[in-house]
């Protein structure tokens, strides 16, 4: 394919939005579903999406949103079966979703580790190999979802790490909460990584420009920040 043709081609977007609990990750996915023309599937891991939507504060149109809960005890098998089902629907030409959302990756990681640990010999504590299984599983899962030809939206909680400069000064950086060994790989596979922030008036925005203090990027367009409800514009 010629590059001149490729840059004009409309391609699905892969976006990771992260924030502290309660700031607006589920609302972000709800707005994606409400404002999209096609159907949205939310793979619910942390069980906060439905309660958030039931408040009916920001999102009001749920007609094109479907929710599938991922088992948060037998998570490895449940997640594997879900990906297999989506692939089969895609291969049969029956995948009728414009967007597939994962809410949220941080909890999915912990659930997988807890599941693997419960089946091990360390009294529920994950073994070193379990961490490696989880890391490969999550990265490969994102590649898998991207291969379905749909928009992929992932949420995560945020965490903060303190960095020290050679001169002794230090600064903190906020980034999506997941295993440090895969954060660059996961974020690298996304077109957009945005931090959900709230201003003094209570309006939610999506920060999509990297700073010294926040992990972010936008390879979809030239915006550095936008209102959450305007992300699809």
Question: Model regions: which residues?
Answer:
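Conserved P-loop
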Residues: 2-102, 106-107, 111
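Alpha-helix C-terminal capping segments
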Residues: 29-33, 145, 232
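Short, well-ordered beta-strand core segments
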Residues: 40, 152, 193-195
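Generic beta-sheet signal
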Residues: 43-45, 155, 196
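Hydrophobic, Leu/Ile/Phe/Ala-enriched alpha-helical segments that form helix-helix packing faces
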Residues: 86-90, 142-146, 190
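Structured loop/turn residues at beta-strand edges in well-structured enzyme cores
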Residues: 95, 148, 188
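P-loop NTPase motor core
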Residues: 99-184
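Conserved GTP-binding G-domain of TRAFAC-class P-loop NTPases and closely related GTPase folds
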Residues: 144, 160-233
């Amino acid at each position: 394919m010629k590059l001149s043709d490729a840059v004009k081609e409309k391609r699905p977007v892969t976006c990771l939005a992260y924030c502290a609990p309660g700031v607006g990750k589920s609302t972000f996915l709800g707005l994606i579903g409400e404002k999209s023309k096609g159907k949205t599937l939310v793979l619910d891991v942390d069980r906060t999406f439905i309660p958030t939507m039931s408040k009916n504060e920001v999102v009001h149109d749920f007609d094109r949103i479907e929710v599938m809960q991922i088992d948060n005890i037998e998570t490895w098998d449940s997640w594997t079966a879900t990906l297999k089902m989506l692939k089969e629907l895609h291969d049969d030409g029956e995948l009728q979703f414009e967007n597939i959302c994962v809410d949220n990756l941080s909890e999915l990681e912990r659930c997988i580790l807890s599941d693997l640990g419960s089946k091990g010999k360390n009294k529920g504590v994950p073994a070193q190999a379990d961490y490696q299984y989880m890391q490969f599983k999550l990265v490969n899962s994102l590649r898998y979802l991207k291969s379905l030809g749909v928009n992929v939206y992932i949420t995560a909680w945020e965490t903060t790490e303190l960095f020290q400069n050679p001169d002794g000064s230090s600064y903190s950086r906020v980034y999506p909460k997941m295993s440090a060994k895969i954060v660059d790989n996961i974020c690298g596979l996304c077109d957009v990584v945005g931090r959900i922030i709230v201003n003094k008036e209570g309006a939610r925005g999506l920060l999509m420009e990297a700073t010294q203090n926040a992990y972010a990027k936008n390879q979809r367009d030239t915006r550095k920040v936008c209102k959450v409800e305007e992300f699809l514009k």
